[in-house]
Amino acid sequence: MSAAWAQMSPVGTWRSMDEKENTPKAQVKITEAGGVVTGKVEALLRKGADPNALCTECKDELKDKPVVGMTLISGVKKVEGKEVWEGGRILDPENGKTYTVRLTPVDAGQKLEVRGSIGPFWRTQTWIRVQ
């Protein structure tokens, strides 16, 4: 993988940010295998966060599983001809809900716009590249 492609790709290590406090919430590692992008929580960064926190709001097999190591992003693929990845899902472990997701690298790949939506409602977070 070329350095330029790596920078304009969601693949890498990212810090998700608390939108209200502008402080890091979690570190997420995004990988790609067979054209499909997946993101897992590596660490919880919020001040006072329990590193052994469980996803108490999650449903099904994720209920009460550790948040660290959990897959948040799944099934995402690159849109042909665009620097956009979509078609997958993102989990919010704080409320246990899953959303459709679109990932768009911006600022020369140093930031990642993570847009989650349910129907006509959406929210965009900006994550910061760590690596």
Residues covered by each model-derived region:
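C-terminal terminal-subdomain/extension
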Residues: 102-104, 111
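Sec/Tat signal peptide C-region and signal peptidase I cleavage site
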Residues: 2-6
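Structural motif
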Residues: 33, 106-108
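Beta-strand residues in well-ordered beta-sheet regions across diverse protein folds
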Residues: 40, 113-115
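Central antiparallel beta-sheet cores of small beta-barrel/beta-sandwich binding domains
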Residues: 10-11, 16-101, 128
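Edge beta-strand at a domain terminus
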Residues: 109, 117-131
